[in-house]
Each structure stands twice: as C-alpha cells, then as structure tokens.
Amino acid sequence: MRHIISVLMENEPGALSRVVGLFSQRGYNIESLTVAPTEDPTLSRLTVTTIGEDEVIEQITKQLNKLIDVVKLVDLTEGEHIERELMLIKIKATGAQRAEVKRTCDIFRGQVVDVTPAMYTVQLTGASDKLDAFIEAIGASAILEVVRSGVSGIARGERVLSV
C-alpha cells in the first residue's frame, strides 16, 4: 500500500542524507521525496512517499523517530489528507493534434505554459492519480519529457504537524 509520511526535522546539513540513508540501508524504496523549510526557519518538512505493508511502514516510522534530526512525524495516509503534485510535461503537438492536446489539457484543468510550432509544455497539479491519468490520456508516443515534483501533503481539518 502507498503511504505518505510527513516528517518535521531539524533544518541542518546532513539531516536529509541521514533520512535517505535509513531508507537505503534497509532496502526501502522512496517513490517521491520533497523537502522545504517551514514557517520556523530552524525546521524543514520532508514528505516521503513509499510503498509497503503496514508492518513495514510501522518499522520505517519507528526507525525515523530514532534519528536525532527528526522532531515529529505522521503517516498522512492514516487519516483524511490533501495531497498535491506538480507536473510539467512536453507534448508533441502538430496539426490536428494541437486541438486534441489542448482539449485534454482543459479537461484536466492543466495550463499551457509554453508553445512552439511542434509542441506544448503543460503544467498540471493534483493528486498523483490525476497526473497519471493525464499521461495515459495523452499517450506515450506524444510525450517528449515529463518532470514531476513529488507529493506534498497536509492533514485535513485541524490536525497540525508542529512542535
């Protein structure tokens, strides 16, 4: 099962390396990883997406909690949450394809951010499933390049990850 783990950690050199090292040493795969400073400049929020059975995820969270740099963490998938990902995608679009690509982009509420005579660059945000569906709708033969930010997530309601 896919899990999104949100980690509040010290904003110090080497902190990210220790978290990634833990995953690597234990043979856990990281599907996506985002990290940025929080409202408190001494802390960073790391959001890691990984796949595993509940027992494996429990083991990961226990090991993460043992790291000196980790202040607090939560598995967002245990409750209601909001997740978003940004994707930039270059799509071949010539002749009649241009209108079809634009229509598909509109259906998925994407934005065309760059246009050349032979292609569109589209920006799309949403849950990973939405981005995957857009890629499938466009078709692999039309895709020139894809860049994705990785998942960012936050708990719904009044639940807050803070010190």
Model-found features: residue ranges?
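Long, contiguous binding/interaction regions
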Residues: 1-45, 49-163
